[in-house]
Curated annotation (Swiss-Prot):
Pathway: Polyol metabolism; glycerol degradation via glycerol kinase pathway; sn-glycerol 3-phosphate from glycerol: step 1/1. ATP binds at residues 14-16, 268, 311, 315, 412. This is Glycerol kinase. Key enzyme in the regulation of glycerol uptake and metabolism. Catalyzes the phosphorylation of glycerol to yield sn-glycerol 3-phosphate. Homotetramer and homodimer (in equilibrium). Heterodimer with EIIA-Glc. Binds 1 zinc ion per glycerol kinase EIIA-Glc dimer. The zinc ion is important for dimerization. Keywords: Allosteric enzyme, ATP-binding, Glycerol metabolism, Kinase, Metal-binding, Nucleotide-binding, Transferase, Zinc. GO terms for molecular function: ATP binding; glycerol kinase activity; metal ion binding. It comes from Salmonella agona (strain SL483).
Length: 502
């Protein structure tokens, strides 16, 4: 029998599909990536072709094994992590989608959400699903498809149509239509799932007129769901053994599996999650309550806060303001000055996310004087990412009663040493940057490997987790609070800008 040497993680993201091969020491052996088309039928609408998602993901699986010269019988298991909330409806018989995937960014269901608010359902939705009423989540997207594709609701009631988030769609295709499942983390992002009862919520299904017959079975994040023989040189059937939504996968990849541990992912935006253990903490400060992965893939809970503009604000400096030619240059220019010269940049280009939730806020630069130059503005833009992270962390600490001792970080912007040091300074806590940057894929790999015994337990994984660099606060509390109070003043003045009644 061939030794099972590797784990494969499939990382299905918003703009690309990736496959990563990892060995027993959690080293990356091979990576393959394919981008796919973003479809914008109308302003504010975002779609993907589900067949293109499948084609890009399945081809990366074949490609990543070929690149590493690995046969499928050397793979112990496959783990899947995915863009969350994106909704797909397809025919059970043919596997053919009845409409394009409606992507998490799509705002077309704003009117449905406004009706839910008028119907007085905000408290029910927050109390039972942990979410706010927003087009972001899957439920209203499924309703929209059933409302607009003729005859689809009746077909769904007859069991002819199936709904799934991207993980469910991939597993359906990988198992040739034999397995229709999701995991608790993805289910918790649909606005259809009761996070306390751990079952689909009948009231929400009734309100949105979504037949239960079309919903997947909900399972743990770490167990064998089915097998696939797609990809590789051999015909061996490989267990599919781990599923988690991308942010929960990153939390697990960072081994934040104990109550009070938190990670922040610095991408286009920022996603911060804090594990709250077996207790679902209701937020009074504009955060989401969501399901995370416990030590062996069982249900834990987390608080989540999203910052809309992180890396995107650096792209703005590069593409629109032309102050830098490459995102990596931002650190160089920021360190050419000793501070921001009193400048604050509030990058509220699309409003403000947690904990403010102000869609009418707009971007602004405050504190301009004659002595301010482009380096000050670049530095202030970088600092805004750290300030927004503190906003979210303060909300988390207020909700949970937990004082954070260290923040684990991942995502593209963590390579910026200036930003990471300033993040530590403004939080007053350690910032830990891991050696392995592929923590989302790592989380999916860990979940799959634990399910099949490739790794025995978390203690074994902890030994493999190497912190590449630790950043510690380098400013006094008085200075920290003075700078942060300036940020709070700037945010207050940027809020409600587009709301002409205020």
């Amino acid at each position: 029998m061939t030794e099972k040497k590797y784990i494969v993680a499939l990382d299905q993201g918003t703009t690309s599909s990736r496959a990563v091969v990892m060995d027993h020491d959690a080293n990356i052996v091979s990576v393959s990536q394919r981008e796919f088309e973003q479809i914008y039928p109308k302003p504010g609408w975002v779609e993907h072709d589900p067949m293109e998602i499948w084609a890009s993901q399945s081809s990366t699986l074949v490609e990543v094994l070929a690149k590493a010269d690995i046969s499928s019988d050397q793979i112990a298991a496959i783990g899947i992590t995915n863009q969350r909330e994106t909704a797909i409806v397809w025919e059970r018989e043919t596997g053919k989608p009845i409409y394009n995937a409606i992507v998490w960014q799509c705002r077309r269901t704003a009117d449905i959400c406004e009706q839910l608010k008028r119907d007085g359902l905000e408290d029910y939705i927050r109390d039972n699903t942990g979410l706010v009423v927003d087009p972001y989540f899957s439920g209203t997207k499924v309703k929209w498809i059933l409302d607009h594709v003729e005859g689809s609701r009746e077909r769904a009631k007859r069991g002819e149509l199936l709904f799934g988030t991207v993980d469910t769609w991939l597993i359906w295709k990988m198992t040739q239509g034999r397995v229709h499942v999701t995991d608790y983390t993805n289910a918790s992002r649909t606005m259809l799932f009761n996070i306390h009862d751990l079952d689909w919520d009948d009231k929400m299904l009734d309100v949105l007129d979504i037949p239960r017959a079309m919903l997947p079975q909900v399972r743990k994040s770490s167990e064998v769901y089915g097998q696939t023989n797609i990809g590789g040189k051999g015909g061996t059937r490989i267990p599919i053994a781990g599923i988690a939504g991308d942010q929960q996968a990153a939390l697990f990849g960072q081994l934040c599996v104990k109550e009070g541990m938190a990670k922040n992912t610095y991408g286009t935006g920022c996603f911060m999650l804090m594990n709250t253990g077996e207790k679902a903490v209701k937020s009074e400060n504009g955060l989401l309550t969501t399901i995370a992965c416990g030590p062996s893939g069982e249900v834990n809970y987390a608080l989540e806060g999203a910052v809309f503009m992180a890396g995107a604000s650096i792209q703005w400096l590069r593409d629109e303001m032309k102050l830098i030619s490459d995102a990596f240059d931002s650190e160089y220019f920021a360190t050419k000055v000793k501070d921001t010269n009193g400048v604050y940049v509030v990058p509220a280009f699309t409003g403000l996310g947690a904990p403010y939730w102000d869609p009418y806020a707009r971007g602004a630069i405050f504190g301009l004087t004659r002595g301010v130059n482009s380096n000050h503005i670049i530095r202030a833009t970088l600092e805004s990412i750290a300030y927004q992270t503190r906003d979210v962390l303060e909300a988390m600490q207020a909700d949970s009663g937990i004082r954070l001792h260290a923040l684990r970080v991942d995502g593209g912007a963590v390579a910026n040493n200036f930003l990471m040091q300033f993040q530590s300074d403004i939080l007053g806590t350690r910032v830990e940057r891991p050696e392995v940057r592929e923590v989302t894929a790592l989380g999916a790999a860990y979940l799959a490997g634990l399910a099949v015994g490739y790794w025995q337990n978390l203690d074994e994984l902890q030994e493999k987790a190497v912190i590449e660099r630790e950043f510690r606060p380098g400013i006094e509390t008085t200075e920290r609070n003075y700078r942060y109070s300036g940020w709070k003043k700037a945010v207050k003045r940027a809020m409600a800008w587009e709301d002409h009644d205020k």
